[in-house]
């Protein structure tokens, strides 16, 4: 997305690398890059972007049939359809758009996961990545109209 199409104070579509797309309403729903996108519309939002760690192990027989979340540690564990344990969490304390994690955070998430599900210690780790997530100061999402008519936000 290159920018917003505007007529007066109204957003009428978006400009992309493949051309213009006109719309009566445009929604900004860009996990991890909402503040960047909002700036293209001239808006400043109280959102910071942080890296959230994620890992997946080799597949095993069913062990977890739902998402287990630990709010105090900002971590979660679930199991994929292919049997891999997916776990992650622990926001990096610095604003970043990097799709990788820093070693102390990676260690912290792995330590919490091992304490929660000790069986992880016997599994091969297949992948690790950092995903960018948007955070407000109180952790609540911003879902609203913007001052520009026709432009909405879910960030």
Label for each model-derived stretch:
Residues 16, 20-65:
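Central helical "cap/lid" subdomain
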Residues 44, 59-150:
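Active-site lid/adjacent beta-loop-alpha segment flanking the redox-cofactor pocket in flavoenzymes
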Residues 12, 51-53, 141:
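Short beta-strand micro-motifs in enzyme catalytic cores
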Residues 10, 14, 22, 33, ...:
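General structural feature for long, well-ordered alpha-helical segments within catalytic domains
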Residues 155:
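Active-site-proximal helix/loop microenvironment
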Residues 1-12:
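A conserved short coil-to-beta-strand element within the FAD-binding core of flavoproteins
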Residues 2, 35, 152:
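Nucleotide phosphate-binding site architecture
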